[in-house]
Regions:
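Hydrophobic face of amphipathic alpha-helices that form TPR/SEL1-like repeat modules
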Residues: 35-42, 54-58, 69-76, 105-112, ...
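Bacterial N-terminal signal peptides
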Residues: 13-23
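Short helix-capping/linker turns of helical repeat alpha-solenoids
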Residues: 30, 42-47, 60-63, 76-78, ...
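Terminal, low-structured helical/coil segments at or just beyond the last alpha-helical repeat
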Residues: 32, 141-176
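Bacterial N-terminal signal peptides that target proteins for export
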Residues: 2-14
Length: 176
C-alpha cells in the first residue's frame, strides 16, 4: 500500500514539476522576446543606454541575436566607445552559435582586417559562406550583399585556399 501511495505521489510530483518547468520556460521566452523588442525600440529611438542595458545581460547569457546587436553598437560606437575588437569578439561568439547576421559581420571583418588583425580571406570566405546558407527570405538583401562580398574575397584566394575554405564550410558545426 505504501509503495502504491509513493508511486502515485512520485507521479503527481513529476507532473507538477513538468508543468512548473513548462510555465517557467514559456514565461522566460516571453520575457526574452519582450526584452529584445524593448531594446530594438530603444535602439531605433536612439536611446542607446536603454538598448545597452537590455541587450548586454542577454548577450552575457549567450543570446546570439543580442550579442550581434551589441556588437553592432560597439562597431558604430553607439552608446559605447567605438571598439572594433569588442565588436569582433561579440560577432564571433554569435557566429559560432550559427547566427547568420553575425557570421556575415565577422566574415566582413576578416575580409577587410577590421578589428581582427590580420586580414584573413580564408576565414572571411568561410563565415560569409555560412551566412549565405543561413540567411532567410526575410534577409534577402543581406544575402545578396553577402554573395557579392564572398565573390570579392574569393577573387583573392588561390584555388587551394578556396578548396580549404569550402571544406571548412562543410565541416563547420555550431557551438552551443
Amino acid at each position: 500500500m505504501k509503495k502504491d501511495l509513493w508511486k502515485s505521489f512520485s507521479s503527481v510530483l513529476a507532473v507538477a514539476a513538468t508543468v512548473v518547468m513548462a510555465v517557467f520556460a514559456h514565461s522566460y521566452a516571453q520575457s526574452l522576446e519582450e526584452s529584445m523588442r524593448r531594446a530594438a525600440g530603444a535602439y531605433e529611438r536612439k536611446d542607446f543606454a536603454l538598448a545597452l542595458s537590455l541587450w548586454k545581460p542577454l548577450a552575457e547569457q549567450g543570446n546570439a541575436e543580442a550579442r550581434t546587436l551589441l556588437g553592432a553598437m560597439y562597431w558604430q560606437g553607439e552608446g559605447v566607445p567605438r571598439d572594433h575588437k569588442e565588436a569582433a569578439r561579440l560577432y564571433l561568439l554569435a557566429a559560432e552559435q550559427g547566427y547568420a547576421r553575425a557570421q556575415y559581420d565577422i566574415g566582413f571583418m576578416y575580409g577587410f582586417g577590421e578589428g581582427i588583425p590580420p586580414q584573413d580571406d580564408g576565414q572571411a570566405y568561410k563565415w560569409i559562406g555560412l551566412a549565405i546558407a543561413g540567411f532567410t527570405v526575410k534577409n534577402e538583401d543581406r544575402r545578396e550583399q553577402a554573395i557579392k562580398d564572398r565573390a570579392t574575397v574569393a577573387s583573392r584566394l588561390s584555388k587551394e585556399q578556396l578548396a580549404e575554405a569550402e571544406i571548412a564550410i562543410k565541416a563547420w558545426k555550431p557551438k552551443q
